[in-house]
Amino acid sequence: MEVLTPHTLDEALRAKADHPGAWPIQGGTDVMVALNFDRGRPDVLLNLNEVAELRGFTRENGSLRLGSGLTYADIEHGELKDVLPALAEASRTVGSPQIRNRGTIGGNLGTSSPAGDALPPLLIEGAVVECASLRGRRRIPLVDFVTGVKRNVLEPDELIASIHLTPSNEPQTFMKIGPRNAMVIAVVSLAVSAGDELRASFGSASPRPVLVTAPRDEADSFAERVAAAAAPIDDVRGTERYRRHALEVLTTRALKRVLA
């Protein structure tokens, strides 16, 4: 297995065009698990750790551009924790400090797992994913980016360059249920915001991201609406019935927090 280490985004895109089957790797928190458990073995690994354009975040006319290499630790401890509080809460629940220091939001989106912790808080903020290739760039709403369990719209020659959103500055929160308090894959997760409109998105309860909205004056029925929008399954972490019930309970608790 060959490892390529580009130093600019242009070099990375050229490498991806030349090796469309290459696996991008930055934090490696998902890729290394896949390799260690023989879930795949590409001919080429594309190491993106030296590509400065993918790191950090910038402000653009009131909007934010989050580099795909932005880590959970960056979000948890940096300036973004006050700007995107639900995403910061989600970041604090991811794995261990070592995982949060390495794991990236671009990796979370690229893996496209229904349990991805970054997806619900990004979705309630209307995030848009910027995909790049030598052919150009395109922006896809996050709600349309993930198409199923570990499937997305990325073309073989594309990389996730960044995520764009305009902070709502609305009360928001993130909650997660698992078999223990830390270092756990979510049985159910939930992000909720409350402005003139209530917005909710959940994880581990549908094959792809779902955004549920309602007028603020329909708060009393919102938890039931969120649970009805889910499409959970039975698996080793929880049953369909439990997940749907837990989602309704979490939504009720989240609403009390954001509407207080």
List PLM regions with ranges.
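C-terminal structural segment of proteins
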Residues: 1-260
